[in-house]
Amino acid sequence: LVVDEVEFPDPGADQILVKLFSSGICHSQIHMMRRSPRPGHRFPALLGHEATGIVAARGHEVKHVKEGDHVITTWVDRNNSNTPQPLVNHTLNDRPQYVAEWNGKMVSHSAATWAEYALASERVVVPMPNDVATDVTAVIGCAVMTGAGAITNTLQVKSGQSVAVFGAGGIGLCA
């Protein structure tokens, strides 16, 4: 793990450059640093996928946000239909996402939020109200969606029902 300068290109047609306010630390990032990556991961890589920030620039095909909008980045692909589809191995259309250049090498990842800026596909950027506190919203893009999504979408727990959550990490606390 190193802290260094990277070069971001201008956003592609369907990309958004986000000036970041805050970023969460997902346990999957720790796994990537400690172990060999899963298929589809490439090194060097900018890690991070859950963050909040403000749109600094956008590609000409991006319609759902504009410069100055506050946004959340996430690991979930909007799939251009507002139906979340998980990114598989942090790729889109089976292609690793190259988002910056470092020491002459292309750097990959889906959102790369452990930086001052993130260059991400519009498919992993969601608008949020500009008056929402940005210091606590970064975890919405992963921990909240995963924990709350497991309870509401997967288990379909109804009001008044009880469940036991084992594990009081970021995801468990959001369940």
Model-based region annotation:
Residues 1-3, 36-37, 108-109, 145-148:
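Short gly/ser/thr-rich secondary-structure transition/capping motifs
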Residues 74-117, 122-123:
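Cysteine-cluster motifs in flexible loop/terminal segments that predominantly coordinate metals
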Residues 28-34:
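Cytochrome P450 core scaffold surrounding the K-helix E-X-X-R motif
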Residues 123-124, 129-175:
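Mid-domain Rossmann-like dinucleotide-binding core that forms the NAD(H)/NADP(H) cofactor-binding site
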Residues 69-70, 117, 162:
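Residue-level marker of beta-strand positions
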Residues 7-23, 36-86, 129-131:
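Glycine-rich beta-strand-centered segment in the early N-terminal region that forms part
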Residues 3-5, 52-54, 117-119, 125:
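Conserved hydrophobic/aromatic beta-strand scaffold that supports enzyme active sites
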